[in-house]
């Protein structure tokens, strides 16, 4: 139980004890409503963060009792307050950039504010200012639109605004499953696990509905054993010997698709090649 103490505001004397200017003035008391908590209402918002000017849609898991109120706080300041009912309502936050607010749902009982639910709101034009990272790493057939929406709703409740796709790609040097014009329905990741293109897309679509940013993981200096067939040149690699017979590599467990052979990330031709392969991903 949290109680807010009343503060007694008294006129103060100067350094010499003189109080002539306020002589005869009586002390004043600021009354503060006591507060307690009963966090029984689950709240959610429709996005992980909001650009200045965007409206926030709040949803309560169950219908709110009559007389329920919500106040919006910026640190110790209350910037808005209203009565709400039903299971959903809309709030227009102030347009100041890079501010975080607390929505505080409460009811009044015997002169006490009883907090029944809280949730934060991030108003930022650029999510990189306050990054909150999450990850997805399973792209099997069971990751349907419904399943990925449910998972991203959970991350959204934690205000995750960036989601990284870990080991989603076909090959480090050729991340897309298929080609720019013909996607594969299913392909194998580096550990020879099935990756469904539909599952990858389901995650991206669910994340974008919550305003999250999707980003894919890849190396800027790695290629697999069949890279020559995909256009990777021998002179782009890093070698362990002066005669350039043994490529440097990151060895992986047996049964995986390939070891990762190290490429010189400063090589301009390699950079151009990998940029083109990344563009294959973005156009799809």
Label every model-predicted segment.
Residues 170-222:
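Aromatic-lined substrate-binding rim segments of carbohydrate-active enzymes
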Residues 1-10:
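Bacterial N-terminal signal peptides
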Residues 116-170:
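An acidic-aromatic substrate-binding cleft motif
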Residues 160-168, 274, 280-284:
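Short acidic catalytic loops
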Residues 129, 158-163, 208-215, 284:
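Loop/turn elements at helix/coil->beta-strand transitions in domains of secreted/extracellular proteins
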Residues 32-126:
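Beta-strand-enriched, solvent-exposed domains that form extended recognition/catalytic surfaces
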Residues 9-37:
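Bacterial Sec-dependent N-terminal signal peptides
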Residues 125-131, 137-145, 216-283:
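Active-site-adjacent "subsite" loops/lids of carbohydrate-active enzymes
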């Amino acid at each position: 139980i949290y109680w807010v103490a009343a503060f007694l505001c008294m006129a103060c004397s100067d350094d010499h004890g003189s109080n002539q200017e306020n002589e005869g003035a009586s002390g004043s008391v600021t009354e503060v409503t006591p507060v307690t908590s009963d966090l029984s209402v689950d709240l959610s918002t429709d996005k992980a963060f909001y650009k200045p000017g965007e409206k926030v849609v709040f949803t309560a898991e169950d219908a709110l009792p009559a007389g329920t109120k919500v106040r919006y706080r910026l640190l110790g300041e209350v910037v808005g307050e209203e009565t709400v009912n039903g299971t959903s309502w809309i709030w227009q936050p102030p347009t100041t950039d890079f501010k975080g607010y607390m929505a505080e749902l409460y009811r009044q009982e015997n002169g006490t504010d009883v907090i029944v639910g809280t949730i934060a709101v991030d108003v930022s034009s650029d999510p990189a200012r306050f990054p909150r990272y999450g990850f997805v790493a399973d792209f099997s057939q069971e990751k349907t639109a419904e399943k990925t929406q449910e998972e991203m709703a959970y991350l959204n409740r934690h205000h995750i605004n960036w989601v990284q796709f870990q080991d989603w790609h076909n090959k480090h040097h050729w991340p897309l499953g298929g080609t720019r014009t013909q996607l594969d329905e299913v392909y194998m990741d580096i550990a020879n696990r099935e990756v469904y293109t539909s599952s990858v897309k389901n995650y991206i679509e669910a994340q974008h509905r919550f305003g999250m940013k999707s980003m894919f993981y890849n190396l800027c200096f790695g290629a697999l054993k069949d890279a020559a067939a995909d256009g990777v040149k021998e002179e782009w690699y890093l070698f362990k010997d002066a005669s350039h017979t043994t490529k440097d590599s990151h060895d992986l467990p047996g049964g995986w698709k390939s070891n990762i052979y190290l490429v010189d990330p400063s090589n301009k031709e390699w950079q151009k090649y990998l940029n083109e392969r990344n563009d294959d991903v973005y156009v799809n």
